[in-house]
UniProtKB/Swiss-Prot annotation:
PANTHER family: FMN-DEPENDENT NADH-AZOREDUCTASE 1 (PTHR43741), FMN-DEPENDENT NADH:QUINONE OXIDOREDUCTASE (PTHR43741:SF2). Pfam families: Flavodoxin_2 (PF02525). The gene is azoR. It is an enzyme of class 1 (oxidoreductase). The keyword Cell membrane does not apply. This is FMN-dependent NADH:quinone oxidoreductase. Binds 1 FMN per subunit. Quinone reductase that provides resistance to thiol-specific stress caused by electrophilic quinones. FMN binds at S10, S16, Q17, S18, M96, Y97, N98, F99, S140, R141, G142, G143. It comes from Salmonella choleraesuis (strain SC-B67). GO terms for molecular function: electron transfer activity; FMN binding; oxidoreductase activity, acting on NAD(P)H as acceptor; oxidoreductase activity, acting on NAD(P)H, quinone or similar compound as acceptor.
C-alpha cells in the first residue's frame, strides 16, 4: 500500500483547471490503487503563511524565545514536513500564474525547506533528505509555455524537489486553456490521457 499526498494550490476553488485535473487524478488513482491512502491538502484554504522576517527566525535554531506567531509557524512547518515524509507519492497541482507557481505553493515550499531536516549541507554540497518519493506535477496554463523560456515552473520545481531529495518527477500539462473552449477542452483531454498513463505506471 502506498500513501499519496495531494497538494492543491489554486486560488480559484471549484473554477480551477488544475483542481479539476487533481480531482480526476484522485478518481483514477483510487480506481486503480484501491488499497492506497490519499491525503488532500489545499494550500489556499486556509493559506500557508508567508515567510517574512519574523517567521524566518522560527526556522533557525537559536536561544531567543519564540513569539506566538513564530511558534505557530514552526508547528505548521513541523506538521507539513512530517506529512510530506510520511507519503510515498506527492501530487502537486501547480497552475501557472504570471509565468510561475502560485504564492500559496511557494509559501509551502518555504516552510518545508529546512536545513538539517529536509536537506543538509555537506562537503560535496547540499544533500536532499526527503528521498524515496515520486512526484507528479499537474500544471494548467492559459497559454503555451512547455519547453519555452516562459515556462519557469518546470525548471523551478525540478530544482526545488531535487534539492530536498525528490528526483523522480513527472509533469502533466494542460496548456492553452485561455485560447477558447475547443483548445481548452483538448488541453484537458490530453492532460487526462497523460494522467491515465502516470497512474498506470
Amino acid at each position: 500500500m502506498s500513501k499519496v499526498l495531494v497538494l492543491k494550490s489554486s486560488i480559484l476553488a471549484g473554477y480551477s483547471q488544475s483542481g479539476q485535473l487533481t480531482d480526476y487524478f484522485i478518481e483514477q488513482w483510487r480506481e486503480k490503487h484501491v488499497a492506497d491512502e490519499i491525503t488532500v491538502r489545499d494550500l489556499a484554504a486556509p493559506p500557508v503563511p508567508v515567510l517574512d522576517g519574523e517567521l524566518v527566525g522560527a526556522m533557525r535554531p537559536g536561544d531567543a524565545p519564540l513569539t506566538p506567531r513564530q511558534q505557530d509557524a514552526l508547528a505548521l512547518s513541523d506538521e507539513l514536513i512530517a506529512e510530506l515524509k510520511a507519503h510515498d507519492v506527492i501530487v502537486i497541482a501547480a497552475p501557472m500564474y504570471n509565468f510561475n507557481i502560485p504564492t500559496q505553493l511557494k509559501n509551502y515550499f518555504d516552510l518545508i525547506a529546512r536545513a538539517g531536516i529536509t536537506f543538509r549541507y555537506t562537503e560535496k554540497g547540499p544533500e536532499g533528505l526527503v528521498t524515496g518519493k515520486r512526484a507528479v506535477v499537474l500544471s494548467s496554463r492559459g497559454g503555451i509555455h512547455k519547453d519555452t523560456p516562459t515556462d519557469l515552473i518546470a525548471p523551478y520545481l525540478k530544482v526545488f524537489l531535487g534539492f530536498i531529495g525528490i528526483t523522480d518527477v513527472n509533469f502533466v500539462f494542460a496548456e492553452g486553456i485561455a485560447y477558447g473552449p475547443e483548445v481548452a477542452a483538448k488541453a484537458q483531454a490530453d492532460a487526462k490521457a497523460a494522467i491515465d498513463s502516470v497512474v498506470a505506471a
